[in-house]
Amino acid sequence: MRAVIVAVGVAFLVSLFCTPIAIKVFTRLKAGQPIRAEGPVMHQGKKGTPTMGGVVFILATVIAYVAGHLALTTLPDAQIAQVEPTITALVLLGLMVFSGAVGFIDDFLKVRKRHSGGLNKRGKLLGQILVGAVFGVIALYFPSTMTDSQGTLTNTETVGSTTLSFIRDIPALELTKVGAVVLFIFVVMAATNGVNLTDGLDGLATGASVMVLAAYALIAFWQYRHWCADPNYTQEYCYAVRDPLEVALIAGAAAGACVGFLWWNTSPARIFMGDTGALGLGGLIAGMAMSTRTILLLPIIGGLFVIITMSVVIQIISFRTTGKRVFRMSPLQHHFELAGWSEVNIVVRFWIIAGIGVAIALGLFYSEFLARVG
């Protein structure tokens, strides 16, 4: 627990104090956000606001992970915990960094061309598929070799699973390894695009991501305290996962980094996370769902992202089939802007929706545990 607290604190402070430096640097480099002409008129005042701020909280998360491990070295946890970095950390941080890199290319092209159109859809899609495939393979093909003090193998789990999961793996829904990789690619694409579509108002995606990541930190730490690698817990209710403390540490660090960034990203935003941050967060959230065996729980935890994504899908289908639009504009937050809601009202109300989704998901997770314990 101490390592997680250290990681959260370090991530928050690094993000809080480095974001204003990034604002100055990106302003000097004229790395301002282009605004699409067909967007809400009130957004034209945001033109030129520094973008690519996701670089800050991605770096803050990586730095905090290292700090958390240093804390784990000097203040060992009473339970089973691997002090050295793990494949799990490689997968989760890799998903965040390389998904963020795809977004960075998109942001860079937007800034360079002074136009809201950056990386084309095919290029972004290929980038997401490549990242999902590479880390999906790593997650499935490298089992843990964790041993106890006597050298006995205590954990052989992989980061991901070939079984579809809700709160745990569902044995009846077994996939092949190829099928599991394809599923994970889909989850990466869905999560990255969900966060990206939500990132349309000051602080909206950042605040929602804080809640989702905090939820995953709680889930992973609970799994760590009831881990099948610990002989004190029975197979009836323990969690068959790999390196849950690592997952909790990274989720907590990312949540802390986002809180620090939110100080500067809240309305009126001094900096935007850009596709760098949105895709980075989406990639990490997808990894969290995979590593905690909660893939089918993700649509509830990230309920706001799902609602906003579905508003775009509904708008497209309606327009192509009937020639009519269901919403004044999509994604959904812009519909309410054009309906006269203030930006702050929309953001706070959407945060409430995000919080409700997180609360329901955590309730389901804990209820399942209680049902097993009896």
From Swiss-Prot:
It comes from the Bacteria. Its cofactor is Mg(2+). The keyword Transmembrane applies. Pfam families: Glycos_transf_4 (PF00953), MraY_sig1 (PF10555). The keyword Kinase does not apply. One of its GO terms (cellular component) is plasma membrane. Belongs to the glycosyltransferase 4 family. MraY subfamily. HAMAP family: MraY. This is Phospho-N-acetylmuramoyl-pentapeptide-transferase. It comes from Salinispora tropica (strain ATCC BAA-916 / DSM 44818 / JCM 13857 / NBRC 105044 / CNB-440).
